[in-house]
Amino acid sequence: RETTGMKKAAGYTKFWSQDSPTTPCPPYHIDCINPLKVSEATIPRLIITEGEKDVLTLNEAGYPYAISVPNGAASDLSKSFEAFEPWMEQVRDIVICGDSDLPGRTLVKHLSDYFGARCLLTTLPGDCKDISDVLATYGIEIVREIIESARPQHTADIVTVGERANGI
């Protein structure tokens, strides 16, 4: 078996492999918008995060339609979402709730480019890396405020450190 993914967190490293016809991996929790399971004709809001833990945080905050890209910020979006395009067509707005680090900001830009005008972007407090940190630091009401205050933003307005490297 070939290692297809690796996740590092405080104090441990998790490796996994996959021998499956679903390579690349589907987005985590994508079945939440499966047309066979959803009674609504249109899903008003789907939230996309960078990690599974963030999806669980959003579910806890009352947002059932939340998914995570399958391989974090390094995900190949076209391969990951291609099979689910018919499912994604039933989604009106896509809230992108990315991490605040450089890979997370880059992922936000890529997701915005990929999904286009229906994207809304969140803004996290400066001392939080992701929405799970917001829950731990500020509580569930602030998580809800962040999601409810998501706004459209042009991808040209999203700047990463790499794009400003020459000016530093």
What role is predicted for each listed range?
Residues 1-92:
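Phosphate-handling DNA/RNA-contact segment within nucleic-acid enzymes
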Residues 53, 73-76, 98-108:
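Acidic, metal-coordinating catalytic cores used for nucleic-acid/nucleotide bond scission
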Residues 58, 96, 168:
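Conserved RecA-like P-loop NTPase ATPase core
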Residues 81-89, 129-144:
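Short, surface-exposed amphipathic charged segments that create phosphate/polyanion-binding patches used
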Residues 106-116:
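Short, aromatic/basic amphipathic alpha-helical patches
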Residues 119-128:
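A generic structural motif
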Residues 151-160:
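Interdomain "pre-motor" coupling segment immediately N-terminal to P-loop NTPase/helicase cores
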Residues 159-168:
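The Walker A/P-loop phosphate-binding site
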